A protein has these predicted regions:
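Intrinsically disordered, low-complexity terminal regions
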Residues: 1-311
Length: 311
């Protein structure tokens, strides 16, 4: 091998090394960005997974077969993986410091969404797919979701609507409001009011420690419904045609019902005591409704009638 040939081969080898080594580095730089503005084909039913340390997340469903992603971060990086089958965005701090992040994503209806923020609000609307959303400090709104729906916030208001599927909602110190729900519902707070309206479900559980619980919805004759609070009122507004067995208990409050109550002799003596415990049937019975509070009132209204005193 002459000198010229050997030099050529070494040059080619060096070029190959230069070409191959930076490739993953370039890919890494492509993933780690401070700003993203991209539109690309995206399959219906695919996943979106977004996680930020501080900032707002907005995800919206639309009818186009594509995704539009806009993201920016003041300090730090956005680790992004964008494909026709999955969108993954995760923020990383710069030397332990991370600025506010803003993420806006448009996806086809039917996309499944996971979103989390340590400090910031989350809004997911019109995706009509599975949703899992959580925030340590921030309000969350979810409108139009199906299948499995899980939404939790530690310190912030939670609002959800147009839910179709198995729904789990929870807050620690924020109010919880949900309406237009079809499917099983579990809702819980520590110090936030719970309001569930327009519910069509055979299984509902709503529990809080120091706030009121309100339920406006249907009663399935074969269903079960549980409502409890320690220091708030329980207000149920159910159809006049409901068929249910009610089990109501309050220690220092009162029980009020718009439905006729027939008490047995033993029940009359129980009502005379300081604590009040009542069991009665409306319609032909069937569904099991349990409501309890320690220092609040229990109010049972017919659907469409909300003029009974709650204080």
């Amino acid at each position: 091998m002459n000198r010229s040939t050997r030099f050529t081969m070494l040059a080619l080898a060096a070029a190959a090394t230069i070409a191959t080594v930076p490739a993953p580095l370039r890919a890494q730089r492509d993933r780690e960005r401070t700003r993203i503005d991209s539109t690309f084909a995206f399959d219906k039913g695919s996943w979106v997974d977004v996680s930020v340390a501080s900032g707002e997340i907005v995800i919206t469903g639309w009818t186009r077969p594509e995704a539009k992603v806009y993201a920016s971060i003041e300090r730090g990086w956005i680790d992004a993986q964008l494909s026709p089958h999955r969108i993954t965005l995760q923020t990383r701090s710069d030397r332990g410091r991370s600025g506010d992040t803003r993420i806006e994503i448009m996806v086809p209806i039917g996309t499944r969404v996971q979103a989390s923020s340590a400090s910031g609000g989350i809004r997911i609307t019109g995706t009509a797919g599975e949703v899992e959303a959580g925030s340590a400090s921030g309000a969350i709104e979810v409108i139009d979701a199906t299948d499995r729906i899980t939404v939790r916030t530690v310190s912030g208001k939670l609002h959800a609507a147009k839910l179709r599927g198995r729904t789990r909602l929870g807050t620690t110190s924020g109010t919880l409001e949900a309406e237009d729900i079809v499917g099983d519902v579990t809702a819980g707070t520590v110090s936030g009011r719970i309001t569930l309206t327009g519910v069509k479900s055979s299984h509902v559980s709503a529990e809080t420690v120091s706030a009121s619980v309100t339920y406006v919805g249907s009663i399935d004759p074969s269903g079960s419904y549980e409502f409890s609070t320690h220091s708030g009122n329980v207000h149920l507004e159910i159809p006049e045609s409901s068929a249910a067995d009610l089990f109501l208990e309050t220690f220092s409050g009162r029980i009020s019902s718009a439905f006729p109550i027939t008490l047995q002799p033993g029940d009359i003596s129980a009502m005379a005591r300081h604590g009040k415990k009542m069991e009665f049937t409306i319609g032909k019975g069937g569904a099991r409704i349990t409501a309890s509070t320690f220092s609040g009132n229990i109010i049972i209204d017919r659907g469409g009638h909300t003029d009974r005193e709650e204080n």
